[in-house]
């Protein structure tokens, strides 16, 4: 028997509307619509004994009471629709409009008998143009000079008169000289003196002179107390530690030993594979499989190599066989003090039927060679300083050469020999070949060499540009067989003195040798 499908009934509000008049409403619908459930009764009975005021705590929507919800730290809320408070300004605003009111004269009515010509009259309105501008200029006269008397000398001799006028004296000029000095902290002045030619002492003297005289400061009176020489600011010594440090911030040995015990150097858990190929430092993926180079890709991250299970690809390097992943480079220091570049790899050697791959962990590493330090070079300070200057005197550092005037070294015949112009190179033509004819249409023919009881060799004529190679030693006096003879080819031994000839064994008919095992 099939179970009837359950049909969802209508909402409680719609059911209450239709069944209330008929009196067939279910009890749960009546309680829900009329709010007579157990929860509603608890609230009704509880509200009779407890009063919460206007907090609005009930089964209805939360409104926060009559004042609404107010966030902490803020003032009362503003209700929408209220009349805002207008704040009047403290100053009385000025009215906008013309400042001066110009009166307009009224015109009398015009009669018909009045002339239509309007006489011109002067306007009595206010002048819109500005009036006269008063200019006030203050004149400050310069300092008045005292009057100078110019002497005039008059001389009279005879009939001519000579008038001598003395030049006007020049008034004294007022000159003002100012000087400004700025201090540069990046520039340091070296006050040490350098022994040069003409100086008799190394004392530091400061001489201040002017146009009328001078005064010497320092070095005049000897010191009567025992003094101590302080080293110059540029002379210092660097103490080398023993043993010398290889890094600027050396680490503790205990930490290095703790790091060596675990990680990639654990030989029990990780296979150690040294790599000699320099591609391991820049492009390690080329050691795992053949591929094209991508100049944009940087191989400084972990690389994963996917390989089909049904195919087997031989890697370029046998040490990277069955490598699935190759980690990023790690730099460390070996006990000998070298820099080591390491990469952690994972092999996938065994594959199960379910598709799982099992392999060992591999540590690929390469030790970089050391950089030998060169011998230190003694450097000197640039500038003028004392104690390290070098003075070279010309007469003392001269070189004297004793030259014999009797000999004439300019004679080329006596000084040099023609044997220096001879070429001492020995030319060796063993194994060379002589080519006769052009190289454009050359043909090569191989001539068989027949071994006979007598030592004799035969060659083809080489007069039409053919190239014949003779790998064995040959004698000049040999017989020549022409390519197109008029008669049948017959081999004649010229060294035979009997006067007869015989057919060469290579020209006879060969008989097949019967094998017993066939």
Swiss-Prot record:
Post-translational modification: Highly phosphorylated.
Family annotation (InterPro entries): Late_L2 (IPR000784)
Compositionally skewed regions (Low complexity) per UniProt: 150-160
Region of interest called Disordered, as start-end residue ranges on this chain: 139-173
Cell location: Virion; Host nucleus; Host early endosome; Host Golgi apparatus
Motif Nuclear localization signal location, chain numbering: 1-10, 509-517
Any Pfam family matching the protein: Late_protein_L2
Disulphide linkage map: 19-25
Family: Belongs to the papillomaviridae L2 protein family.
Record lineage: Viruses, Monodnaviria, Shotokuvirae, Cossaviricota, Papovaviricetes
GO cellular component: host cell; host cell endosome; host cell Golgi apparatus; host cell nucleus; viral capsid
UniProt keyword annotations, A-Z: Capsid protein, Cytoplasmic inwards viral transport, Disulfide bond, DNA-binding, Host endosome, Host Golgi apparatus, Host nucleus, Host-virus interaction, Late protein, Microtubular inwards viral transport, Phosphoprotein, Viral penetration into host nucleus, Virion, Virus entry into host cell
UniProt name for this protein: Minor capsid protein L2
Gene designation per UniProt: L2
Highest taxon, organism lineage: Viruses
Subunit-structure text: Interacts with major capsid protein L1. Interacts with E2; this interaction inhibits E2 transcriptional activity but not the DNA replication function E2. Interacts with host GADD45GIP1. Interacts with host HSPA8; this interaction is required for L2 nuclear translocation. Interacts with host importins KPNB2 and KPNB3. Forms a complex with importin alpha2-beta1 heterodimers via interaction with the importin alpha2 adapter. Interacts with host DYNLT1; this interaction is essential for virus intracellular transport during entry.
Stated role: Minor protein of the capsid that localizes along the inner surface of the virion, within the central cavities beneath the L1 pentamers. Plays a role in capsid stabilization through interaction with the major capsid protein L1. Once the virion enters the host cell, L2 escorts the genomic DNA into the nucleus by promoting escape from the endosomal compartments and traffic through the host Golgi network.
GO MF terms held by the record: DNA binding; structural molecule activity
Organism whose genome encodes this protein: Human papillomavirus 20
Biological process terms in GO annotation: microtubule-dependent intracellular transport of viral material towards nucleus; symbiont entry into host cell; viral penetration into host nucleus
Keyword match Phosphoprotein: yes
């Amino acid at each position: 028997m099939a179970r009837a499908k359950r049909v969802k009934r209508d909402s409680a509000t719609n059911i209450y509307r239709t069944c209330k008049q008929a009196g067939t409403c279910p009890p749960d619908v009546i309680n829900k619509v009329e709010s007579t459930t157990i929860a509603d009764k608890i609230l009704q009975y509880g509200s009779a004994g407890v009063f919460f005021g206007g907090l609005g705590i009930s089964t209805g929507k939360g409104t926060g009471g009559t004042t609404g919800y107010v966030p902490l730290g803020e003032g009362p809320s503003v209700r929408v629709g209220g009349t805002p408070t207008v704040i009047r300004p403290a100053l009385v605003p000025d009215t906008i409009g013309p400042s001066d009111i110009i009166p307009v004269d009224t015109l009398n009515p015009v009669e018909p008998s009045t002339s239509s010509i309007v006489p011109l009259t002067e306007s009595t309105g206010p002048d819109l143009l500005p009036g006269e501008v008063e200019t006030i200029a203050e004149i400050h006269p310069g300092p008045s000079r005292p009057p100078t008397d110019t002497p005039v000398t008059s001389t009279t001799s005879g009939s001519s008169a000579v008038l001598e006028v003395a030049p006007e004296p020049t008034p004294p000029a007022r000159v003002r000289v100012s000087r400004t000095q700025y201090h540069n902290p990046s520039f340091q002045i070296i006050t040490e003196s350098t022994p040069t030619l003409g100086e008799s002492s190394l004392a530091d003297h400061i001489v201040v002179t002017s146009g009328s005289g001078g005064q010497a400061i320092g070095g005049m009176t000897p010191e009567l107390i025992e003094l101590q020489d302080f080293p110059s600011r540029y002379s210092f010594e660097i103490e080398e530690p023993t043993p010398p440090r290889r890094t600027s911030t050396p680490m503790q040995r205990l930490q290095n030993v703790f790091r060596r015990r675990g990680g990639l150097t654990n030989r029990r858990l990780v296979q150690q594979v040294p790599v000699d190929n320099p591609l391991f430092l820049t492009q390690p993926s080329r050691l795992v499989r053949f591929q094209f180079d991508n100049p944009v890709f940087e191989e400084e991250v972990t690389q994963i190599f996917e390989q089909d299970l049904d195919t087997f690809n031989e890697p370029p390097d046998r040490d990277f066989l069955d490598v699935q992943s190759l980690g990023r480079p790690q730099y460390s220091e070996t006990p000998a003090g070298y820099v080591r570049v390491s990469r952690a790899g994972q092999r996938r050697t065994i594959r199960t039927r379910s598709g799982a791959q099992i392999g060992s962990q591999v540590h690929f590493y390469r030790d970089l060679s050391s950089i030998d330090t060169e011998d230190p070079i003694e450097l000197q300070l640039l500038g003028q300083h004392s104690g390290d200057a070098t003075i070279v005197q010309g007469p003392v550092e001269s070189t004297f050469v004793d030259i014999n005037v009797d000999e004439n070294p300019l004679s080329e015949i006596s000084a040099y020999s023609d044997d220096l112009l001879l070429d001492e190179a020995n030319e060796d033509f063993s194994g060379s070949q002589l080519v006769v004819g052009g190289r454009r249409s050359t043909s090569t023919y191989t001539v068989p060499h027949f071994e006979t009881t007598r030592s004799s060799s035969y060659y083809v004529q080489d007069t039409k540009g053919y190239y014949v190679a003779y790998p064995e030693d040959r004698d000049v006096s040999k017989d020549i067989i022409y390519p197109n003879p008029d008669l049948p080819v017959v081999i004649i031994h010229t060294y035979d003195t009997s006067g007869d000839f015989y057919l060469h064994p290579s020209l006879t008919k060969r008989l097949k040798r019967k094998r017993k095992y066939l």
